[in-house]
């Protein structure tokens, strides 16, 4: 009495678990509860989008409305990542019939705010949310850290995936604005197309400079010191991968121009960055931060392997195709 409304968490708090033999009759049994009680529900599985079908499912099976339990921005399923991206993986337009919604955050209190800002907007009004998702995401940085808004957004655009996730097989959106350019440049490299003065290659090199500058600006000028401390492992990882991409592209260009010294020097920079990329401890004693894991690091890894395979044979002193000035 006097405790309404209550929200109850069943053992089978998602569609998959509710169908296990041990939980098969649980939702049906819940029909006997007071009608005011809502049910904690994570959707089709443990970490799932908010869909109309799953909201209807729990209502039909239990007779109660769902209080949607969204497992975001918690990163327990992929601790090498920290989630600063948009929430389009979870958001669906116009879902009705929920009693409410709650977020399961990570232990990174300051970094959680990017996701929580967006979830608050979604929970307040989910009509046509997808049309406004990008704007809401960008607004978060202006609201949270206005003194480094642009730099924070640049960082977040490349630090949002959930690497090696046990729950989200295809990962979260990350580096989407570079997706086409990365693919095109990689194709040019593999096909032997001329790289010097290529507009896409130069654009990608310039973007890596901007990422490195954003990291430096954020570290120096963000007034939220706790935020900087939380993100520092991922900032170091992102700085490495951006530095590495710039260097390996310069190396590939030099390789085509028969400049062995330039090719080798930049290759060394890229290889070192690639080796350091996932060596920064996130604070739990074991897990290492992985920034740019969806597109940037795979690109760096593949181009580094390509340059190595083409550069190493030319370091043979008997080879006359190159004239290494450092001999």
Language-model features and meaning:
Residues 1-136:
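Catalytic-core regions of glycoside hydrolase
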Residues 133-326:
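Catalytic domains of carbohydrate-active enzymes that cleave complex glycans
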């Amino acid at each position: 009495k006097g405790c309404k409304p209550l929200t109850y968490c069943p053992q089978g708090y998602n569609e998959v678990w509710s169908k296990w033999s041990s939980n098969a009759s649980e939702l049906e049994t819940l029909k006997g509860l007071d009608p005011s009680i809502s049910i904690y529900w994570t959707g089709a599985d443990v970490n799932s989008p908010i869909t109309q079908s799953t909201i209807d499912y729990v209502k039909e099976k239990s007779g109660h409305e769902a209080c949607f339990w969204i497992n975001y921005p918690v990163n327990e399923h992929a601790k090498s990542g920290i989630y600063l991206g948009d929430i389009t993986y979870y958001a669906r337009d116009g879902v009705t019939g929920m009693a409410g919604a709650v977020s399961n955050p990570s232990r990174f209190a300051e970094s959680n705010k990017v996701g929580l800002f967006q979830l608050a907007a979604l929970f307040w009004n989910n009509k046509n949310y997808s049309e406004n998702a990008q704007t809401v995401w960008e607004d978060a940085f202006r609201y949270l850290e206005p003194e480094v808004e642009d730099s924070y957004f640049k960082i977040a655009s490349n630090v949002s995936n959930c690497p090696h996730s046990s729950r989200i097989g295809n990962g979260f959106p990350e580096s989407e604005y570079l997706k086409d350019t990365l693919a095109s440049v990689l194709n040019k490299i593999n096909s032997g197309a001329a790289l010097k003065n290529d507009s896409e290659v130069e654009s990608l090199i310039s973007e890596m400079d901007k990422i490195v500058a954003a990291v430096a600006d954020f570290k120096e000028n963000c007034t939220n010191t706790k935020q900087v401390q939380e993100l520092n492992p991922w900032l170091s990882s992102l700085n490495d991968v951006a530095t590495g991409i710039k260097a390996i592209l310069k190396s590939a260009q030099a390789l085509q121009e028969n400049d062995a010294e330039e090719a080798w020097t930049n290759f060394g920079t890229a290889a070192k960055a690639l080796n350091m990329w996932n060596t920064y401890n996130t604070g739990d004693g074991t897990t290492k931060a992985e920034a740019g894991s969806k597109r940037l690091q795979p690109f760096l890894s593949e181009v580094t392997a390509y340059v190595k395979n083409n550069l190493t044979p030319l370091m043979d002193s008997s080879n006359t195709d190159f004239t290494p000035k450092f001999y």
